[in-house]
Amino acid sequence: MHVNGKVALVTGAAQGIGRAFAEALLLKGAKVALVDWNLEAGVKCKAALDEQFEPQKTLFIQCDVADQEQLRDTFRKVVDHFGKLDILVNNAGVNNEKNWEKTLQINLVSVISGTYLGLDYMSKQNGGEGGININMSSLAGLMPVAQQPVYCASKHGIVGFTRSAAMAANLMNSGVRLNAICPGFVDTPILKSIEKEENMGKYIEYMGPIKDMMKYYGILDPSMIANGLITLIEDDALNGAIMKITTSKGIHFQDYDTTPFHMKMQ
């Protein structure tokens, strides 16, 4: 898919990886709906992007993605404003082992809800033109993490859901592709949250190994994750792909064993 002229919706767009996604999409000629619960950060983000791009290229909507009604209303506003939806990026996420219900609601449930809402608007079965859905996971979605069991579970859930939903979308001839991104440590506010007891709870005492891993593996810049996003959008052959991004190997993909049964549905 060529990005130029397309309409994208990015959750968690006010800062970090989400903001890098928005800027990368705008540079490619897309119109972008900036969705974030943080009103102050969202307004500042749009103002900064307006200095670089035409103001009509972006729309900021304050939304708590964990609130189903707010999320549904946000999709409606985006389509009413821009006329369509071509690219959906479910990026909003948190790290909170203390309030683990919140972590699951934002990191996993809202991604599933957002994906289904995106399919409602983009699927050819519903009169849409097709499109692409990118869900943000993590390397923690591919391996165990002792200090972040709930965060880890939420990211594993995204990987399993995305791969399965991609097969389903293809089976139904929806015209929508679904992929996920699993980066290593990225320089974002979430990374800083691992140092706070209010986020980590009882696991705060055991963060030494995580900090050692950060020093060993290094920390990615959000712009590198944005490069991965553009790759997943522009390569029409990628559906159900799980992209890994690390400082040592850059952009690469997770390999999975497949059966003839799975091959028929891909």
Curated annotation (Swiss-Prot):
Source organism of this protein record: Bos taurus (Bovine)
Entry similarity comment: Belongs to the short-chain dehydrogenases/reductases (SDR) family.
Protein's UniProt keywords contain Nucleus: no
Binding site for substrate: S138, Q148
Biological process (GO), any one: female pregnancy
Lineage start: Eukaryota, Metazoa, Chordata, Craniata, Vertebrata
Disulfide bridge partners, by residue number: none
InterPro entries, per database record: NAD(P)-bd_dom_sf, Sc_DH/Rdtase_CS, SDR_fam
Binding residues for NAD(+): 12-20, 36-37, 63-65, 91, 151-155, 186-188
Protein name per the record: 15-hydroxyprostaglandin dehydrogenase [NAD(+)]
Gene3D superfamilies tied to this protein: NAD(P)-binding Rossmann-like Domain (3.40.50.720)
Top EC class for this record: oxidoreductase
Documented EC number(s): 1.1.1.141, 1.1.1.-, 1.1.1.232
